[in-house]
Amino acid sequence: TDTFIWEYAKAREYVLVSKDNDFRQRSFQFGAPPKVVWLHVGNATTSVILRLLRESQRDILRFVQQPEAAMLVLGLKDLP
């Protein structure tokens, strides 16, 4: 369930990467941890999502290193 995943990630200080709007809402409601990278990509293919994650690597690393940051939104507009 979403609650189990959230609590598991929180206890281990993981970063969740998801297209699921429920995790975006949880991030707004509870903040971090865990941090959430929310993929606003609709029905994008796996290869498009992989490209987005690779192209956004610097932004993701910067986000993870910011203690006050709870959520990073990545979308297709972020692709060159």
Please report, for each region that a protein language model flagged, where it lies by residue.
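Acidic, metal-binding active-site segment of PIN/NYN-like and related structure-specific nucleases
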Residues: 9-27
